[in-house]
UniProtKB/Swiss-Prot annotation:
This is Ribosome maturation protein SBDS. It comes from Xenopus laevis (African clawed frog). The modification N-acetylserine is found at residue 2. Keywords: Acetylation, Cytoplasm, Cytoskeleton, Nucleus, Ribosome biogenesis. It is found in: Cytoplasm; Nucleus, Nucleolus; Nucleus, Nucleoplasm; Cytoplasm, Cytoskeleton, Spindle. Gene3D superfamilies: 3.30.70.240, Ribosome maturation protein SBDS, N-terminal domain, SBDS protein C-terminal domain, subdomain 1. Signal peptide: none annotated. Associates with the 60S ribosomal subunit. It comes from the Eukaryota. One of its GO terms (biological process) is cytosolic ribosome assembly. One of its GO terms (molecular function) is ribosome binding.
Length: 250
């Protein structure tokens, strides 16, 4: 599709329109095809690679720009780049039913892939296949949301699947080394955040290799930095812990 904008004599091609209705008005932005979903998933971070122009339209196909007073009333600002970001994140991507169906199917698959990669069966410590996760998502009638990133939705799926099957986030393996004088006190503070201690060496320094829930990593990192005043070290040994030699099962 080629769109001619008579107001500025720019011909926009390969256009994907994102639309938002706000304050009783319709606002549209012109984006490059295949870039909107990349932006929403976090894969694309350069706005200039997504937007064809940092302009807000009433109607992209007719080249009708939005009035400043309408933008101010609806969005509380005249900054068109910021408004473009809002529309890009929360607006409705205008695509054909076939295109929409294909995009949602791909997002469904991507979400299942993330869940399968990040989770295990807590009883066997074995990972699940993508196909099994897809079937489980269908069983709970999970509906993909085009405006949310696949990573965000994967977290939602994990929470919902916990109600129907044995599943949990795979553990992260860490090694941390802290000065001996901080060791005992710090270990007590870290205990509630550690799932399992694999090895512990207390000589001139305290060195511990342990498994944690990935959601606790930031808190552990902050604790070690604050309590040791930057003298402690924290190393991620593996992002997920599954039993070696085990194969994925359906």
């Amino acid at each position: 599709m080629s769109i001619f904008t008579p107001t500025n004599q720019i011909r926009l091609t390969n256009v994907a329109v994102v639309r938002m209705k706000k304050g009783g008005k319709r606002f549209e932005i012109a984006c490059y095809k295949n870039k909107v979903m990349s932006w929403r998933s976090g894969a694309e971070k350069d706005l200039d690679e997504v937007l064809q122009t940092h302009s807000v339209f009433m109607n992209v196909s007719k080249g009708q720009g939005a009035k400043k007073e309408d933008l101010l009333k609806a969005f509380g600002t005249e900054d068109q780049t910021e408004i473009c970001k809002q529309i890009l994140s929360k607006g409705e991507l205008q695509v054909s039913e076939k295109e929409r169906s294909t995009q949602l199917e791909q997002m469904f698959r991507d979400i299942a892939t993330i869940v399968a990669d990040k989770c295990v069966n807590p009883e066997t410590k074995r990972p699940y296949t993508v196909n099994l996760i897809e079937r489980a998502m269908k069983d709970i009638h999970y509906s993909v949301k085009a405006t949310k990133s696949t990573k965000q939705q994967a977290l939602d799926v994990i929470k919902q699947l916990k109600e129907t099957m044995q599943i949990e986030r795979a553990h992260m393996r860490l090694r941390f080394i802290v000065p001996a004088k901080d060791g005992k006190k710090l270990k007590e503070k870290l205990k509630p955040l550690i799932k399992h201690i694999e090895s512990e060496n207390f000589d001139q320094e305290l060195e511990i290799v342990c498994l944690i829930d990935p959601g606790c990593f930031r808190e552990i990192d902050e604790l070690i930095r604050c309590e040791t005043k930057g003298k402690g070290t924290l190393e991620v040994l593996s992002l997920k812990d599954v039993e070696e030699g085990d194969e994925k099962f359906e």
